[in-house]
Amino acid sequence: MTNKNTSKDMHKNAPKGHNPGQPEPLSGSKKVKNRNHTRQKHNTSHDM
């Protein structure tokens, strides 16, 4: 009974803002940062 409650609580807390909140934004931030960096560098070169 306690295990079921913990599992439900962990599952709700994990995918709510722990699992999809940390690995997803981390992976997306890395890809977006890399893309943004390349775009910014290109933009700076073009502006110059």
UniProtKB/Swiss-Prot annotation:
Coiled coil: none annotated. Induction: Expressed only in the forespore compartment of sporulating cells. It is found in: Spore core. It comes from the Bacteria. Residues 1-48 are annotated as: Disordered. The keyword Calcium does not apply. InterPro entries: SASP_SspP. Signal peptide: none annotated. One of its GO terms (biological process) is sporulation resulting in formation of a cellular spore. HAMAP family: SspP. Belongs to the SspP family. This is Small, acid-soluble spore protein P. It comes from Bacillus velezensis (strain DSM 23117 / BGSC 10A6 / LMG 26770 / FZB42) (Bacillus amyloliquefaciens subsp. plantarum). The gene is sspP.
